[in-house]
Amino acid sequence: MNDLKGKNIIVTGASGGIGNSIIKKLNQAGANILASGTRTEKLDELKSKYKNIKTLKFDISQSDKIEEFVENATNELGGSLDCMVNNAGITKDNLAIRMSLEEWKKVIDINLTSTFLMSKFAIKKMLKNKSG
């Protein structure tokens, strides 16, 4: 992961356990990280624990604000983006047979639609930067 030194990376779902592990590895590799999540206290812990990290609270279920989020996150990283780690997502502790259609739609919207939109807008930034 030495080739990530100085690279600007957005990590969604950073306030959870997997996100924290991803950030630890990226930080060890010398990346500049923009960590995003929904829990302010967890994001504050990341800022105090790691160097080269900035945070933005964001809920990826707000699909109409994803383009604005990617813009703001990229600006926080100095205006360029090299990588997007789509780690945010949800699960429902429910069997499909008991899951309502509304619950299913929420899982799909967050885990698929929001990831698609994050990638779409991040790719535009990476192409502009000729990186990623």
Predicted regions, residues:
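The beta1-alpha1 cofactor-binding region of Rossmann-like NAD(H)/NADP(H)-dependent oxidoreductases
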Residues: F58-F69, L101
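Conserved glycine-rich Rossmann-like NAD(P)H-binding loop of the short-chain dehydrogenase/reductase
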Residues: A29-D44
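Substrate-binding pocket helix/loop in short-chain dehydrogenase/reductase
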Residues: L95-A96, E103-I108
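A short, exposed helix-loop element centered on a Lys and neighboring polar residues
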Residues: S119-K120
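Conserved NAD(P)H cofactor-binding loop of Rossmann-fold oxidoreductase domains
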Residues: N87-K92
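Conserved glycine-rich cofactor-binding loop
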Residues: S15-G16
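Active-site loop of short-chain dehydrogenase/reductase
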Residues: K7, G78-D82, M126-G132
